[in-house]
Amino acid sequence: MNLLKKQFVKRNYHKETLKITIDMAWPAIVESFFVAFAGLIDSLMVSSLGSYAVAAVGLTTQPKLLGLALFFALNVAISALVARRRGEKKQDSANETLLTAIFFIVIAAIISSIAFVFFASAIIDFCGSTADTHNDAVVYFRIITGGMIFNCIQMGINAAQRGAGNTKITMRTNVTSNTINILLNYLLINGRFGFPALGIRGAALATISGTVVACIMSVASIFKKESFLSIPYILEQHIRPTLSAFLNLIKVAYSVFFEQVLMRIGFMLTAIMAADQGTDAMAAHQVGMNIMALSFAFGDGLQATAVALIGRSLGSGDPDLAKEYGRTCRLIGAVIAVCLVAIYYFGASGLYHLFFTEDHIVAIGVQIMHVIIFVVIFQICQVIYMGCLRGAGDTLYTAVASMISVTFIRTIISYFCGYVLGWGIIGIWMGVLGDQVSRFIFATVRFRQGKWVKIKI
């Protein structure tokens, strides 16, 4: 608390700015944390089937996220544009953006879903599956991608709601969705209370069921007449999807899309190298990624807050306030990072013992956790600063920075330390650390330069 107070005074933060940031940030943080926590619980429940099952689910993560790259990019554009229009007090333009995005999302999701289901086996094979993981990974991947349209729609609407500052709506949606996911995991993976024991198939069905509920809740949230984003308002004002709105989305999203694709390629190469270390090492790696996702969740929640507040400030013509919101989010993130470092340091062994009874896998996991401790320090702050830049429309810079860091630095260091130096799975995690440090440097330098506040979107 003394550290927080000293930084607060030193940087001349305004109490009102901090209050507004916290009020908007806590629902976004809870939402992101709960999504990551549900992923960790998924792995915990799947681990009851054996380390091969954890590895099988882990194999599907990066190709699934690669398939969602287009939608992640679109979500960044939706949030940034809606936030900017909110600041400009242009409700009609914000709703036009939302409606145009939804139409595009539905078409793109249907096409993507069909392609992933059809090519599932080849994709999983490319990702480094083995005889004991391939079939289960394919089944899981087909179910998840077969229902991706529900996930894509709810992500798009939630992105718009975050841009408008309605973080409590998206929190309720995702907390409900993931609660259903966890409950159905408990019932369907091993078969309880008369439900069939479906194993990995049950885990996938639980995830899809939660996503369907989230989609319904998200759609319902835009049927309120008094909301800034509102279907009744759209009908009343005769708003239609337009080419100009679509082009605005593409203008912001195109560089984010390439950023996402190149990042996912880098992540996938890391996952392939991890899978090459053996099923046990891959299982430990997957749990480590889930634990790291918990720390990312805090940064992601603050990032969503920064996008909304910075977009609104720039839209109303106040770049100094936009910078202050960015610094405030970063300060909160730094305090959270210190707390997580302490938890991960003292709880490393205990966390891995929740997932595995095999001592050699736990030993691998503890070594991974020692790397994650350093990763977290840079990760949360870079995620927030990158979010600030994207929210202002500086997406080309973030794309180049992420490409250099993830696709090249991460991959090269992982290969060198993992194979050339012979450090195995720990060497691969050194690549993860190098990536986070690189992105932190890129993001911090750009944020402090201040050029991003002058970008028009």
Name each model feature, range by range.
Residues 1-28, 82-149, 197-254, 310-375, ...:
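Short alpha-helical transmembrane segments in multi-pass integral membrane proteins
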Residues 23-42, 143, 177, 210-214, ...:
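Transmembrane helical elements of multi-pass membrane transporters/channels
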Residues 28, 32, 43-44, 80, ...:
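Transmembrane alpha-helix boundary and packing residues in multipass membrane permease domains
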Residues 30, 34, 38, 67-71, ...:
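Residue-level hotspots within pore-lining transmembrane alpha-helices
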Residues 37-55, 124-131, 187-198, 257, ...:
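Helix-terminus/linker motif at the lipid-water interface of multi-pass membrane proteins
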Residues 46-65, 132-136, 200-201, 244-252, ...:
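Interfacial/gating helices of multi-pass transporter permease domains
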Residues 54-114, 151-170, 282-348, 379-403:
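Small-residue-rich hydrophobic transmembrane alpha-helices
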Residues 75, 79, 144-163, 170-178, ...:
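Short runs within selected transmembrane alpha-helices of multi-pass transporters and secretion channels
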